Structures are given as structure tokens and as C-alpha cells.
Amino acid sequence: MSDVLPPNSTIPSSNVPRAPSKWWREPELALLLVLVVGAYFTRIPALTIRGEESRRGLIAREMLETGDWIVPRCQGVPLFSRPPLQNWLIAVAGSFRGGVDRFSLRFPSDCAILLTVLMIYGYARTFLSKLGALTAGAAYASMGQVVELGRTGETDALFTLLVSGSLLVWHVCQVRGASPYKTWCLGYLLAALGTLTKGPQAPVYFAGTVGIYLLFTRQWRFAFSRAHVAGIATFCAVYGMW
């Protein structure tokens, strides 16, 4: 008997990878939280302003002062070298602190690192043991460049969260047999937010990686569907709102 499934058949539910229903209560995840909070949140304002942080802070400050959250400006001059999502988050953090300072400048990046680690752990638990998921999350949190850039007000940490999120969320939905509309729309939603963070690299990374995966696994027909069109429309709607 052939082991190849008929074209319209589905994988038996018993063979579909699923994360434990309460993986967020596992002590290994708590250990990761302690690691990230200790490494990233305890000394947020300790470093001096460096790199592009000053520009990010000035743009966020002008957003708060002028009330114009659409056009990013630095010293009154429109600046479109980077989309504004990172600046929005810095400005929101600054509004709770009475102004943009080193804490509000870096807090969004630290939160992005934390959320990325949580996402990696949850994704890994779909396929790996607790130890494997712990290792995956700790490996990301302790990477040299992540530690360096994750403690600054640069866009890299947030961009990584959104682009990796678009890929991991799409893949989890796809392997679990979620609605194709949910799969594509969530993936493109996160890719659109990534575009609002750093530019058009996000949809290239998302579509390119997903396309190669579908070709490699011989599931390329999954890309030719109304659900995929709905996902692209979601991307255009989210990015177009800016």
C-alpha cells in the first residue's frame, strides 16, 4: 500500500504537532523570563545614548510635542528613512514618563526581546521537549548581537520579533491545519508590522521563506488560493493605513 496521501486527504489529528495546552505554566519558561528580565530590564538606562538612538528619540519627542504621528520629523525636517512604528512605541513609552528618556527609548526593544523569547519557546514546544524549547529560547536571548542591539533603541529587536513572528505563526497554523485564511492573514499582518518598523525587507523575507518551504515540501498549491489573496490584502490594508 502506498504511503502517499491522496490529494484531498488530511493528516490524522493524532499526527498533527501540538504544543502542550498549558506550556506557559512550565518552570522552564519561568527560568527564561528570569534570564531575560535580569539581562535586559534591570539596567535599561545604564548605557549612554549611541548609534541611531538619538534620532529615534528626537523623532518620538517631536511626535509628542506636535501631535503629528504620521510624518516622522527630526528637528522639523520630514524623515522617511525608516517607517514610524518604532518611533510610535518610544513615544507611547515616553508619554507615561513625562518625556522621552533613555528608559522609554529602549523599553520597546527590551519588550520585543522578551516577546521573541516567549514566542520561540511556545513554537519550539510544538515539536521539542521542555529542555529543547528552553535551549532554543536561551540561545536567542544570549546571542552576542541580540544582547548588544537588544539593549538599545534601534529597530532591530522589534523587526526581528515581527519577521520571525510572521514565519513561526504562519508555520504553526499551517502544520496544525488552521484555516488557510487565518494562516495567511496572520502571517501577512505581522509582515506588514515589520514593514512599518524597518521597510520592505519584511515581506521579502516572509514571502521568500514561505515560498521556498512550500516548494520544498511540494505544497505549492497552498499559495494559489483566495486565502493567500486575503493575506496580501491584509498586508496592504495595514501598511496602507500609514
Residue ranges: model-predicted function:
Residues 2-242:
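Membrane-integral, polyisoprenol-dependent glycosyltransferases
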